[in-house]
Amino acid sequence: CIYERGNLAMVKMIGRHGHENRIMDLFRQDPDVHFVLCDTYEEVIGGSDLVISAITKVTENFVTDEHFKEGCTVIPICTMGFQNCDLFFDRVFTDEIEQIRGFKYFDHFAPVTTNVADVLNGAAPGRTDNVQRILVYNYGIAIHDLVFAANLLARAETPDTPYRYCRKKHFIRCF
């Protein structure tokens, strides 16, 4: 989870199996990133501006509604643990409505659902105020490929673009 403090990005994590140390090592040289290790999901999610979760197996919601501050954005790579957000978040963004149509609370959040591509193309507004809680069910059907390809192309057009070969595997687990 991430929240801002001035120009600093504060990254809150729960430590599991030493993964948190590898993540901190990746960013140790960046003076604008600070890490906070937490013991509970309430500590991690409470007060965070951005919540990203890639957990694949959970049987209940991580936290109760009051831990999601106004203005936060939640991006669950796997949607488990965040079903309560379906019921009270102000906006839901998705890249493919058909993939979420079968969700338990789809009928509740369908009226506030916006396609991510529509936002990127300017056909629909993104965040319209600083208090909206936004849930992003983005499975990356093709939009990620297009963004990465555009960035790679732009960098390839720049002479002497530095490239550092990855020699280690990094698996980042926030929860």
Q: Which residues does each predicted region cover?
A:
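Short, well-ordered alpha-helices that flank and scaffold nucleotide-derived cofactor binding pockets
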Residues: 1-4, 154
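NAD(P)-binding Rossmann-fold cofactor-contacting core
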Residues: 3-29
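Conserved beta-strand segments of alpha/beta enzyme cores
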Residues: 10, 34-36, 134
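Short, glycine/serine-rich, charged loops/turns that create anion-binding
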Residues: 18, 81, 140
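Charge-rich, low-complexity terminal tails
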Residues: 21-56, 155-175
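Rossmann-like adenosine-cofactor binding region
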Residues: 32-107
